[in-house]
């Protein structure tokens, strides 16, 4: 495509260059790079409400959703000087200068460099010490379909309501569901992870045939896994309203709870979501106005510790944590020699 086929978008007081706008990004949908830009412009107010002010990790797809990708925490060289950034860290202490989703112009810039959606930190760049989101990732294991994930989400809602905590569901844009809890910014990510470990364990106790808190895949069986480690410090999660790198342009879409029982996630795409929002509004529109307390879940975590339960295993890239059991799959631990 010739260079003069590029387009310029005026958004949030900026002129953002979009190169190769007619490149097909989602073949099954017949949707282009500029269709993706247009989608984000259409739902911009809602996207600002969930992503605004958060650091973001870039995942770049130069050839669209079906092509190869690479992750990039650092803003690339040659980026415009108006981009806002903040310093983020990895579990081993390495720092990067990451993009901050300061406004919609930053999202359009990210699309232009090949991002389809963004992976967001659970805190605002202005307050990196305090997570203001708890993220419950309901992950289907092998042999599990969306009906089981749906059932697990409703079980999770019931437990949260019992604890006086308001949760907000969304599709992942793929096979699972997320439930977000907007928190008062009073706790760090270590506390949030501990809270979700306790939640996962209690859900497994109540629904052992449906839900598992087992970190090791060999122990999960055909159950829905509550991935508590998505709340570990420095972890990012794919943000609400962003399109996934799937050929059909599926979107990670916030839902009302009554929609969980009937939603068909693959039908929620960059073509259908704007009209859906116009018709029934933004289910997460007032979430930030009602921040929740983590204390009921932390009390549950304390009760587990008092009962002798150790911490749950951490991902391999994290240093060994106090109270963590041996970081080895149970089958391997059983095979280890007893002698020195």
Model regions and ranges:
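Short beta-strand
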Residues: 59-61, 167-173, 214-218
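Short, conserved phosphate-binding/catalytic loop or strand-edge motifs used
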Residues: 171-181
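Catalytic palm subdomain of template-directed nucleic-acid polymerases
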Residues: 180-193
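C-terminal accessory nucleic-acid interaction domains of nucleic acid-metabolism proteins
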Residues: 1-30, 37, 48, 52, ...
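Long, well-ordered alpha-helical scaffolding segments within enzyme catalytic domains
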Residues: 39, 146-165, 192-208
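SsDNA-processing nucleotidyl-transfer enzymes
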Residues: 2-12, 41-142, 146, 150, ...
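Catalytic micro-motifs at enzyme active sites that drive phosphoryl/nucleotidyl and oxygen chemistry
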Residues: 121-125, 165-171
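Nucleic-acid 5′ end/cap handling module spanning
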Residues: 147, 170, 183-185
């Amino acid at each position: 495509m010739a260079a003069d086929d590029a387009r310029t978008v005026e958004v949030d007081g900026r002129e953002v260059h979009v190169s190769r706008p007619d490149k097909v990004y989602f073949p099954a949908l017949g949707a282009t790079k500029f269709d993706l830009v247009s989608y984000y412009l259409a739902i911009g107010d809602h996207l600002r409400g969930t992503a605004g002010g958060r650091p973001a990790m870039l995942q770049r797809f130069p050839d669209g959703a079906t092509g190869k990708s690479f992750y990039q925490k650092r803003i690339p060289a040659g980026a415009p000087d108006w981009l806002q950034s903040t310093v983020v860290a990895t579990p081993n202490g390495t720092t990067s200068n990451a993009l901050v989703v300061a406004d919609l112009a930053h999202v359009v810039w990210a699309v232009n460099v090949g991002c389809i959606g963004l992976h967001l930190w659970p805190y605002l760049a202005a307050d990196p010490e305090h997570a203001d989101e708890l993220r419950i990732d309901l992950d289907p294991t092998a042999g599990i379909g969306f009906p089981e994930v749906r059932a697990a989400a409703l079980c999770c809602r019931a437990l949260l309501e019992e604890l006086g905590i308001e949760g907000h569901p969304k599709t992942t844009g793929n096979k699972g569901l997320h439930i977000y809890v907007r928190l008062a910014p009073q706790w760090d990510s270590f506390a949030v992870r501990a809270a979700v470990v306790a939640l996962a364990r209690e859900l497994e106790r109540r629904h052992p045939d449906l839900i598992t808190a087992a970190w090791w895949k060999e122990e999960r069986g055909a159950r829905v896994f509550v991935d508590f480690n998505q709340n570990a410090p420095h972890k990012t999660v794919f943000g609400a309203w962003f399109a996934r790198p799937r050929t059909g342009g599926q979107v990670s879409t916030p839902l009302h709870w009554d929609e969980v029982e009937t939603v068909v996630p693959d039908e929620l795409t960059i073509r259908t979501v704007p009209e859906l929002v116009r018709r029934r509004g933004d289910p997460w529109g007032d979430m930030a106005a009602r921040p929740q307390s983590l204390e009921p879940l932390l009390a549950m975590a304390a009760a587990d510790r008092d009962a002798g339960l150790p911490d749950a295993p951490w991902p391999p890239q994290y240093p060994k944590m106090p109270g963590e059991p041996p970081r080895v799959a149970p089958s391997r631990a059983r095979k280890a020699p007893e002698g020195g």
